[in-house]
Amino acid sequence: MLCVAMAARPVSSTTSTCRPCLPAQVSASKPSTSSSPGTGVLVGVPRERGSSVSKAAIRGARLEAAARCSLVRQRPMLLATVAVGSLVAAGAANATEIGDSLLGSSGLALADLSVGDWFGNLLYSAGQQANEAVQDQLSALSFTSLAVIFGAGLVTSLSPCTLSVLPLTLGYIGAFGSGKDRSEVVGNSVAFSLGLATTLAILGVAASFAGKAYGQVGQGLPVAASGLAVIMGLNLLEVIELQLPSFFSDYDPRAAAANLPSSVQAYLAGLTFALAASPCSTPVLATLLGYVATSRDPIVGGSLLLTYTTGYVAPLLIAASFAGALQSLLSFRRYSAWINPISGAFLLGGGVYTLLDRLFPATSMVM
């Protein structure tokens, strides 16, 4: 019997190298029956089996060492994966909380926004976009520019400021056309619209001769127009009372115009109504006036102003073509007590908003 002594030293997990510690080589000397403590154990096996056992032990030690080295190498990658996963999870949680808060705040804002505010913001945005479109078209005039300016006139005629005087305009056209055929009503409406266009053209000529366009007069003209709108709104709301001088109180324009033809009366009425509605068309109109003042071309300037005023008065012409519908609107005269307060509220709100926007522009608040 041959005694083969094997001693296996365990592999340390803290070593920086991954070399397996192999068992002691099989001793080829004579068999020994003693064993020293800590060096191994006596295995009484035949010589043939001793060789096979040592090979199996070596193979097992190598596999164990390779497994431990693989674990050591993969530990940093595992830790990095866990760290990245934690960061992604935390970011997703924060994004969810932020999204919920934004949805909650937007839902609250939409809930607080009334239909009137939404409609007013829509009309205001449409007016600003129309003004920007006109400015873009003035850089290179074409037939498309005329269509854009005509559309800008339509948008301006639907502004809240213009709508505040729309009941008066419709009431005048309806009352003026009572008892007359449609052709005469349409003719008077055209004369009324020409009166509006004349006032706007006079403003353009005055601005051209003075050499002061909307963008060159600073804050004076918009602030003055806004202040006038606020005063007129307070007057319609009966907060303040405006009295004309005695000369105007003794003068009755209706009696003076009674002997004039109906078309002339409509034309004069258009001149008066345009004075009330001209501050409402300030953005687009002033852009056109500025271009006319700088281009010094009366033909081009007159064509642009005519196109704009045509779009501005187009809703009135369309309304005038439905004389029967206008007459049916007169049946609601019992509700006319609400016209002045509503018109005053429109004028007051538009005047205050424009005044604050001119005095404290939003661009100056941007850091």
Curated annotation (Swiss-Prot):
Q: Tell me where in or outside the cell this protein is found.
A: Plastid, Chloroplast thylakoid membrane
* Bias kind Low complexity: ranges: 26-45
Record-level GO BP terms: cytochrome complex assembly
Q: Which UniProt keywords apply?
A: Chloroplast, Cytochrome c-type biogenesis, Electron transport, Membrane, Plastid, Thylakoid, Transit peptide, Transmembrane, Transmembrane helix, Transport
| Entry annotated with the keyword Oxidoreductase | no
Quote the cellular component terms of the Gene Ontology held in the record: chloroplast thylakoid membrane
The transit peptide spans: 1-68
InterPro entries tied to this protein? Cyt_c_assmbl_TM_dom, Cytochrome_c-biogenesis_DsbD
- Give a short account of what the protein does: Probably involved in the transfer of reducing equivalents from stroma to thylakoid lumen and required for the biogenesis of the plastid cytochrome b6f complex.
Database matches in PANTHER family: CYTOCHROME C-TYPE BIOGENESIS CCDA-LIKE CHLOROPLASTIC PROTEIN (PTHR31272:SF6), CYTOCHROME C-TYPE BIOGENESIS PROTEIN HI_1454-RELATED (PTHR31272)
Q: What is this protein called?
A: Cytochrome c-type biogenesis ccda-like chloroplastic protein 1
Origin organism of this chain? Oryza sativa subsp. japonica
